[in-house]
Amino acid sequence: MFSRSILLRSVRKSLGRYYSSQAHPQTYIYNLLSDTKCRSCGIQLQDKFPDKPGYYRLPGQNDSNTDNKAKTSELNKKYEKILQNLDISDRNLLINNFSAPKQDDEKVTSVPSLQQITPVEADTRDTTKDQQTHSGHSLSCKRCNDVIYNSKTRSIYDPNRDNLNKSEFPIPKLQQVLSTIPVDAPLVYVFSANDFPMGINKDIFQYRPPQQIYFVMTKSDILIPKTNVAFYNNFKKFLQNYMFKKFNVPRENVFIASGKDRWKMTDLYHFIPNYSYIIGDTNCGKSTLVKSLLINHHVKHWKYEARQQRPDEKQSSSASLKNKDFKKLDRLIDSFSSKNGPGTSHIPGFTRDVLPVDIDGIKELFDVPGFTTNENLQDIFDKLNHKQIARITKGANTSKYGSLKSKFDTVKNGQVLSLNGVGYLQFPGQDSMYQIRNVTKFALHKFKNLEKVDSILQRNEIPKSMSSHFIVNRQQQQQQRNELRGYYKRYIIPPFYGTIDLVIKDIGYINIKPTGKKLTNELMVLYLHPSLEAIIRQPILNYIDPPTPKKSPDGTNRKTITSDISKTPFYSRLIPSTVLSDPSSLVLSPPSSDYNQLNQYLQIDESSESAYNDLLELDETNKYDYWIE
């Protein structure tokens, strides 16, 4: 039975590649090269040039260019001496049983390298393919192995480490990515629920009509509880209406799923067309989504086999699994995930080339490198290690941290809210008060004002009691102080009435709710590291758990909030502001200066009634007049 299933799988895969080649010759080329690509990032593998991309080493292969050089114990030396006296057939048999003695902190050096196994003039791709067949699963390049196993506590872009610097994590532009995709191939655009709608690049519609693109929101587990069907249906309806009214995307072309929790994977399998290319912003969750589809298919087979191994029990697809079956299933998933691509990582630019992924011998997808519009995206990661990146990009659960019942903090009277030291949100003064709900993994801290922030950053060391509030290490505080004065970008938060979300790309959002009587028109200001981007939007919770519509004075029901999508802005860009005039001080600029910059940016005449100033009254009727999408 097993042999028959393998045969059918091979036939289906061959037929699939044949029909794919008829429609898309470029797709056929990707398939031909798939056996010699890194299973994690998709780059073409090679074993001859350690200083070039795609280099990989066999387990135990010595490499003079690495800091961790392979060591040979006395026991291994004796083993090698005995090995040399054996016949070739016996030697190969002994090597292949993987029984070479080794210590925990040592690498086996008795396994010959590729250069020793094959002639020097042999083609690198053939060598790679032979090794894949021999090992039983695909290979990963050295860069990917370094990221997975050696980057837990060090900067991921350390220039002193081989094959682990910015050049190894290229992030292309949208146009570059699309140039690698056949013009008539299906496109699936993946965007994250973590920073919606920032993950949707409107430039995509310059290359494809909206009717020909499928949109998938992933990471939805941080927005919607899996068990709450009503919340899911509410938000799905809103998202479909939003995509249709804003971009003319057919409602049936919009889907919501979670790659991390493998939520809605069976439905997603049927939603995505065959031979689709999976595109989206870097770090949006494309590879995780594709891998979850692959794992979901294998899980079905593993569950089926587990039930078949219990002949005395009723055989049905709904038969429950035992605890030992689930434990075995978890081990199988972990083992399968570690040996099969695509690779997943929190590091931007991890996927480097188009990577074909065969799901079940019938459906094949192509994982594509993520793109970005932010040229400074990688700068912040110079200061972070792998664990820090994983923490801040994980996202926080809305139902736990962003609901009306969630814990909140209070900011008032011109205080400054530090976003783990990579951003500073300056609140208005004059008896203002705000409730803050932190739906990010940032550690927030309140300072009295910007002068207090500056005084702390002037110190040689950050006090230990406050070190957790700054994500960068102590040696970088002086640099950060200088950056805050000039390098950090200054943004004016557009005027708002009621509650808003301040959304930070790839990170999450902070819910801001004014309380008490409004006494000032002074604007909020955000100082943000240039590697990060932010917007404000209407509270996302209103579209997950919509408030009950109030009745009009005539007794009729008012329209729901989702009916106003096309009439009011859902989000607004922040207003770029000029840098402080005095670089030696962080003295606050007068509110009138921010008013002028806001009016100029929105092209509003200072003398008109709609000009923003201290005399303007902001209410329900004009609260979106100063928002710009």
Swiss-Prot record:
Q: Which InterPro entries match?
A: G_CP_dom, Mito_lipid_metab_GTPase, P-loop_NTPase
Where does the source fall among the domains of life?
Eukaryota
Please verify whether the record's keywords include Mitochondrion. Answer: yes
Here the transit peptide covers: 1-19
Q: What SUPFAM superfamilies does the record point to?
A: P-loop containing nucleoside triphosphate hydrolases
Q: Name one GO cellular component term.
A: mitochondrion
Q: Which UniProt keywords apply?
A: Mitochondrion, Transit peptide
GO MF terms listed in the record are:
GTP binding
Q: Where is this region: Disordered?
A: 104-138
Q: Where is the composition biased (Basic and acidic residues)?
A: 122-132
Give the family this protein belongs to, as stated in its UniProt record.
Belongs to the TRAFAC class YlqF/YawG GTPase family. GEP3 subfamily.
Function, please? May be involved in the mitochondrial lipid metabolism.
Q: Which PANTHER family match?
A: GENETIC INTERACTOR OF PROHIBITINS 3, MITOCHONDRIAL
Q: What is this protein called?
A: Genetic interactor of prohibitins 3, mitochondrial
Q: What gene name is listed for this protein?
A: GEP3
